[in-house]
Amino acid sequence: MNKAVHYLGRYSASEQRLREVLGRFAKRKLADTEPAKVASATNNVVEKCLRLGYIDDAAFAANQARGQRRQGKSTLAIRQRLRQHALGDAAITMALQTADANHQDAEMMAAIRFARRRRLGPFFNGVPDERTRHRHMGSLARAGFSMAICRTVLDTNSIDDLEELERDAGHSGQPGE
């Protein structure tokens, strides 16, 4: 239990991730112990952590989705990342809805943030040519953005226009925003 609490004190983790960490620890420290006993002890610790609220896959997924969205990750990239943590599709969908709740077009906002971070499209400092445009298009597409969003970001002429588009995409029309 100490190892689990120490790990969860340092890192946010899903149930599956905690199982993996405890399994590796047990394999390293308890090599002579029966695997069935180790698995049982690991399950007991994980169940106790769940009961005490130390791990919550829904909250973990929501926090990860919000953080990834702020970094400019596409919905596809966020889904793949959360699947690596062995989270179910329902939890992932709910996390994405929570992360995108206050934004009209969160995918567009994420694409603009990605372009800004990678200096693509209007954020590019050099002289844009056709080859550069193809490279930028490929970079956005590999990041999981649709071709329509890629074209919109790259076809915008100025940074000011793109920032206005980002503000429009972020406004949900709800009072208080």
Predicted regions and their residues:
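An alpha-helical, amphipathic repeat domain used for nucleic-acid recognition
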Residues: M1-E177
